[in-house]
Amino acid sequence: MLDIENEQRNLLYNFINSIKEKGKHIKSQVYQDVFADFLISKKYNKTFLEFGATDGLELSNTYLLENYSNWNGALGEPDPQWHQQLKKNRPNTKIITECVWTKSNEEVEFLSSDNGVLSTISSFRYSDKDTMYNNAELRNKSFKKINIKTISLNDLIKREFNEISPSYISVDTEGSEYEILKNFNFSKYKPIFLTIEHNY
């Protein structure tokens, strides 16, 4: 029992040190990037897939990994208002502009909000009204609707990662996370670490 407690204490100590070391380079909200690096980098392939990437910098769960820890991967962002800035901020990363969804080769109506980080598939525009009312209000205050081609998470990994799951997958799609993951083949693709930001 004492050995387990010491091991847990050491892990926590090392994780806190990782946060201190990476300090100013951390872009994530709750240290997802540091934890992914801490968990994966010494044992597994340093590959990531982040979708809902916005500008690839602010609130990014993978910026630190790519730029300060030699990871590589792909970023998904369907909202055109972010594409120019995303390419500028992450010039060495593959950018996917299709909308990750349950199926590929469909078109979804996408709500491109003037409050860009809150953009989502139109059918999810009020998905967080009971839990994060301010988000729903801001999202729906001013926007435009556009049609965007879809790709499933399974097909995205098949195409961009040669059917080998990235070690870390970060999902932040403002409401559609569950539907996307419900159709994901967890038997075939086994990420080591998965973070899901949701509004429920």
Can you say where each PLM-predicted feature lies in the sequence?
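Phosphate/nucleotide-binding beta-alpha loop and adjacent structural elements of enzyme active sites
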Residues: 1-200
